[in-house]
Structures are given as structure tokens and as C-alpha cells.
């Protein structure tokens, strides 16, 4: 199994499973063909693969479910929040292009919104990076119980995928399952196969 397959399975499975709006994964330079292949395969299922940043050695790839991201970005509170950072957009694609431009400078902490993090927690981090109540997939400042349950779902999904890959399986098996069962308008978590849930 290639390092790219493992990284995608480990870091992005929760997004393909519908548990998360989007994920980031760092890949070695030279894996552009893999990204393009997956992007074509999943475009009809509502997923987008976007190269946010690259340097001499690494690629930072953003993978999202377009419909879910669009719904979140166009919620009034999120749109007003992003406007504070200069975002003006008529589509999720336009917002992502602006994020990509901002990635050329200091790391933009509003990226949490693009990953589907609760707005209250994104704002909390900007106010007080060290004042979180709980730390998991993101730093939590409110609704701790709900966040803890979400983190546990993420953990179970990722752990099962990684266990399968560590035993010699291929992440492609899960990608093929996600591809088959995803739909462009999927707005809720998918029912994963037994091997993804029997932990």
C-alpha cells in the first residue's frame, strides 16, 4: 500500500463516510496524478479535491462534500463571520478560491469553517487559542458533550479504516464503497459496512 493511499484512508475516511464536511491531508509532492484520478472518480458523487497549498516537498489537499459545504458557507452567521476576513462569494467555489489565496500568507484560522467546525468554536479559538474546554479534531469552547460524541464517531471510523490497512488491506476498498454509496445530495452520514462499525 502506498503512503498516499494510507494517508487518504486515515485522514479523509470520515469525510467520505459523511461524518465530516471536509478534511485536509498532506501528501508528498509528485502525487498530483492520484489527486486528479480520485477527483474525477468522486466528482459525480458530490466531492471536490482541491490543492490548497504546495511547497517543494508537500501538497496540502482539501477534500469536501460540495453540497454540505455550500449549505454551511451560506448560513447567515458563517457568511457574516467570513465577511470579516474579506470573503465575498456567490458560490462555495468562489469562497474556496479566496481561501486558497489566503493560504499563500500566514495560515488562515478561519479555515476551521471550511472544515465544518462549529462557528462558536472557530470564534472561540480566535479569541483565546489556549482557553478551550476540550481538544479533539478541533478545539472546543461550547457544546462539549456534543463535540465529544462527534470525536468518538470520528475515532471509531478512522480506527477501523487504519486497522484494516495495517493488516494489509487497501484503502481503495473503502474508497470504492464510499464511491458506490455516496450521492451528490447526501446530507447525512452514510451507513457504513459492517467492517467500518464492528470495533
Q: Language-model segments: which ranges?
A:
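A structured, charge-rich N-terminal accessory region that forms the first stable segment of a protein
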Residues: 1-55
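Short, surface-exposed beta-edge/turn micro-motifs
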Residues: 20-22, 57-59, 108-110
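A glycine-rich, hydrophobic loop/mini-helix early in the fold
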Residues: 35-91
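Short acidic alpha-helix initiation/capping motifs at coil-to-helix transition points
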Residues: 73-74, 99-106, 129-132
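Internal catalytic-core helix/loop-beta-alpha segment
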Residues: 84-109
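Hydrophobic/aromatic-rich, well-ordered segments within soluble, folded domains that form packed cores
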Residues: 108-134
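Long, compositionally biased
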Residues: 137-187, 193
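Gram-positive cell-envelope targeting signals
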Residues: 192-199
